[in-house]
């Protein structure tokens, strides 16, 4: 038995997944902010011990990894939906112009990759640089 979806069902699946991804993004942004707060407080406190600095570094690196996973999962989700649109395009039902535009801007059936695109990579590198330099650089009097 072959499953046959209508375009509206595919769009609903896409937006349901993106809603869940939005909640995950709010968590990632919150934890990036917490990383900035940690690094700022460690920079301001010259007496912070090395264990706290290592823990804060680990926290910031984990949050950066979670952001990479979020970038990858949202792209993978969109590409999976584009794969469903590609199947629908070849069926009797056909595909609407909006579905065609979505399909043209996606890479159907592409595997999940943690490699960020350039703006995502620059964003994460900037955030990590600011956080880690604040944690490990000595405060200038």
Regions found by a protein language model. Give the residues of each.
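Alpha-helical transmembrane segments
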Residues: 21, 25, 29-33, 51-68, 119-122, 129-130
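Hydrophobic alpha-helical transmembrane segments
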Residues: 19-20, 94-129
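Cytosolic-side membrane-entry/anchor segment at the start of a transmembrane helix
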Residues: 1-36
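Amphipathic, cytosolic membrane-interfacial segments at TM-TM junctions
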Residues: 38-55
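Juxtamembrane non-transmembrane "cap" segments at the membrane-aqueous interface
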Residues: 73-101
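Transmembrane alpha-helical segments in integral membrane proteins
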Residues: 29-40, 113-141
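Hydrophobic alpha-helical membrane-insertion segments
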Residues: 54-82
């Amino acid at each position: 038995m072959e499953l046959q979806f209508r375009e509206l069902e595919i769009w609903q699946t896409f937006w349901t997944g993106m809603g869940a991804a939005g909640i995950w993004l709010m968590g990632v942004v919150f934890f990036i902010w917490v990383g900035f707060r940690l690094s700022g407080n460690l920079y301001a406190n010259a007496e912070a011990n090395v264990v706290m600095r290592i823990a804060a570094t680990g926290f910031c690196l984990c949050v950066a990894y979670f952001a990479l996973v979020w970038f990858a999962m949202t792209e993978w989700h969109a590409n999976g939906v584009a794969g469903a649109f590609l199947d629908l395009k070849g069926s009797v039902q056909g595909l609407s112009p909006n579905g065609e535009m979505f399909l043209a801007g996606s890479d159907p059936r592409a595997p999940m990759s943690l490699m960020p695109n350039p703006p995502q990579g620059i964003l994460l590198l900037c955030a990590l640089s600011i956080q880690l330099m604040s944690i490990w650089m000595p405060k200038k009097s």
